[in-house]
Amino acid sequence: MKKYFKKSWYKGKYRNISIEKYPGLYRPGSSPYFSGDTLRKYADFIFDETQSFKPRNVKKNNIVFVKTDLLEIYFSYYHKKIDSEYILVSHNSDSAVTKAETKFLDDKIIHWFAMKLDFPSNEKISPIPSGLENKRFLTNGKIKNFKEVEKKVRTDFEKYDKKILCSFNVHTNFNERKPLIEKVKNNNLYDIRKFTSNYEYLSELSKYKFILCPEGNNFESHRIWESLIFNCTPIVRSNTVNTNFFNLGVPLLIIDDWSYLNGLTFDDLVNLNQININKEYRKFSTWKYWKELIDSKTL
C-alpha cells in the first residue's frame, strides 16, 4: 500500500491530506477495536474511492458509508434517488464535517454519524471517532500488537508506574505539535520518547497514566483511541471535535491551551482527571460500543 500526502488549506492552517494508491485491494476490519474500515465493512452500502451503489436498492434502516471527501457528490447524485429512511456514516478522511453540511440533512436520514464533527452534535448528527489506524496500512493498526499488550497488562503489576508520555510525529501537524514539544521539553514530568516499533510504543503506553494527544490531520488523533484501550488518559487541547466526544462520555482531559501544562503539577492533573474516574475507558475504542450506538438509531 502506497500512501502520499498533499497540503490542504483549512481554517487558516495547512494540513496534510492523505492520498492513497490502490485503496480497494485490502480493506479488513479491526474488530474487536474500532476503525474506519471496521465501520465501512459493517455498512450495507459504500460510496468511496473504490465503489458506489444503486440508490434505489437502499432499504429502511440500512447503513450507508460515505467517504467524507465525497459528500458533495453523494448528496448531489445519490441521496436524492434514495426512497427509504437510512443511517448515514461519513469517515475515512482528513476532512471535517462542518455546519455547512447540515444543508444536506432531511427526513430520509435517520441519523448521521460523522467523523471529525466540527460543530456541536444534536439529535440528528453525532460524532464517531477515527479509532485505530486502518489495518490495511500494516503499520500502527496491527491488531495482534494491541491484543498482545492487553494480555501482558492483565498480568503486569507494575502498570501505571509512569506519568506522562509525549510521543508523536511532529511533522503530521507541525504548527500544532512543534510548539507543544518546545513547551514541555524542559519539564521532567513529560517523557519525550521515540520508539522503534509499534509494539514497543504500545507496551510503554500501557504503563503511563497520561499521554499528550495533539491534533494530527485535522482535529483528531488515533493516539486518543490507542491510549483508551490501556486506560491511559489522553490530554487534549480544546476544540469542538474533542468536546463532542467528551460530552458523549469519552474520558478526555481537555485543556484550553498547551501553555497551561507547565503551570500544572502531576497531582494537579490527577485531581483534574477525577472527572473521568468512574468511566470505562476501553469501551470507547471497541467496535462493540459504536456498533450498538449505530444500531440504536434504527426505526
Regions found by a protein language model. Give the residues of each.
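Nucleotide-sugar donor-binding catalytic core of glycosyltransferases
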Residues: 2-222, 233-250, 271-298
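Short alpha-helix at the nucleotide-sugar/activated-sugar donor binding site of glycosyltransferases
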Residues: 228
